[in-house]
Structures are given as C-alpha cells and as structure tokens.
Amino acid sequence: MNKFSFTKMHGLGNSYIYVNMFEETIPESLLSSLAVKVSNVNTGIGADGMILICPSEVAPVKMRIFNSDGSEGKNCGNGLRCVAKYAYEHGMVKDRSFFIETLSGLVKAEVTVENGAVTNVTIDMGKPRLKRSEIPMIGLDAERVVAEPFEVDGKQYEITAVSMGNPHVIFYVDDITTAPVTTLGPIVEKDERFPEGVNVEFVEVVNDHELHFRVWERGSGVTQACGTGACAAVVASVLNGKTARNKETVVHLAGGDLIITWTDEGNVRMTGPAETICTGVYYY
Ligand SMILES: N[C@H](CCC[C@H](N)C(=O)O)C(=O)O
C-alpha cells in the first residue's frame, strides 16, 4: 500500500491538500488522478485540490497546484499564502521574506509571525498580463479585453479579462447575492474563446476601494475564495475606472477578506490569512 503524509491548509476557506515533496515521492503520472481522489469529500480527504511544495533551483520552494478535476493550474493566490506559512514554520526558509517559484514565474512572500506562527502573509504577485494573447483569449482585435461585449446563449454581457499567470474573466453585477455563479460560471469556464479555459469571477463594486466577489474556478467550480481571481478583479476594476490604482482595496470573498493593491510600479500585492487545518497520512 502506497502512502504519503499531507497537511490540509486553507486560505479563506479555499482548502488544498499540501504535500511536502522534499520528504515524499509520488510518481508524476499519478499526480492528476491523486488530486481528484484526495479532493473528494466522501472517498478522499476533501479539498479544492492538491498543492505540492517542491524543491526549486531558483527559490527556496516551488509550488505546483492541481485543481479538484486533476488539471494543473499555473498559479494560486490562497495556495501561495499557505505555502509561505508552511515553508517558514517548517524551517525551509529562515527570513520572513522569500521567493516562491510557480509555473507562471517567481513571486515574493512576506510572512507576519506571532509567537512563532505565521498569522498573515503578503504576496507580491508580480505584474498582471493584460494582452488578449496572454490571457489567453481569442476573438476581437483589440489588444486588451476591457469592457468587451460578450454573448452567451443569446444574452449580452460585458467582460474584462486579466491573467495573473492563470486566466480570469470578470463580470460586474449590481447584487453579488444574485450573481449567476453556478449557471453562467460553468458555461464560460469552458467557452471556446478561452483556449485554456478560464476562472469566472463576479464582482459588485461598493466604492473605489471595496468590492464584493464570488467565483466559479476553472477545474474546481465554486470555491470560498480565489486569490488570483481577487487580484484580477482589482486590476479589472482599476482598468474600468471603478477602483483606485495604488490604493489598498478590500475584496470581500465568501470565505473572508483580502487586501489587494495594484501599485503604481505595476505589481499586485495581496495580503491575507493562511491556516493549518490538520495533518495525516493518505493511502493509495
Ligand atoms: N483554479 C485556478 C487555480 C487555483 C486558483 C485559486 N484557488 C487561487 O487562490 O488563486 C486555475 O485553474 O487557474
């Protein structure tokens, strides 16, 4: 019987099964199917996916993230905060500020420590990718996708698309409590205009530094929070003149709040909690 030790952690209720690949060995060919199995709340552990904390040649640690459908994502904001917490608390890094490698490049983490435990984490997520080709999205000629008409099943919408290393499309709504998350979300996730699929976000603007946010995630469906999605929502809101550049913006997600700033230098900074739920051994 094969097995590996895991730590279940969450960022605002967006939980993953974390595996320390400095200590565990799992065949590459099994990673996708294992992500599906461990995510199952009935026959597995229960989570939005699986995250591997791996050795890296360019940073103290590398994060790989697998959604609950087994697809591998290229970035994960809530995951990065939990990886930073894990790395610091397990002595994998000595400084409170350090780099983490992702499939979409290097990001910088800064942990807040109280009595030896990481209570909050800031991630410099780097620059958003705004070109249509970088999302990626196919369709009109305009280089960026900002307030673009978008038809779905004969209904007209307006979208803005942003990549944080992974693809996001933002719909603005008047009332977040009635956003079509579970009806429009799964349709747009697989829309052919997004060749790699897309994370689908719904945003209600409160004022120039406050948003309400819900998400249908590519590969995981409805989650309590999406860190990269919240970053994309802030960038989209600045591009649409709805929130202020270089100003801390509170994003209210179902699982709690993130503080996000798109700085004048161009980077997106995200601050929020990261929590450990439990540890255990998974048999497969
Ligand atoms: N579903 C995403 C990966 C997880 C992102 C999200 N959980 C976050 O916190 O950023 C994707 O396939 O791009």
UniProtKB/Swiss-Prot annotation:
Example GO BP: lysine biosynthetic process via diaminopimelate
Keyword Isomerase among record annotations: yes
Active site positions, chain numbering: C76 (proton donor), C226 (proton acceptor)
Site description Could be important to modulate the pK values of the two catalytic cysteine residues, residues in chain: H168, E217
Any single Gene Ontology cellular-component annotation: cytosol
Subunit composition and interactions: Homodimer.
Record protein name field: Diaminopimelate epimerase
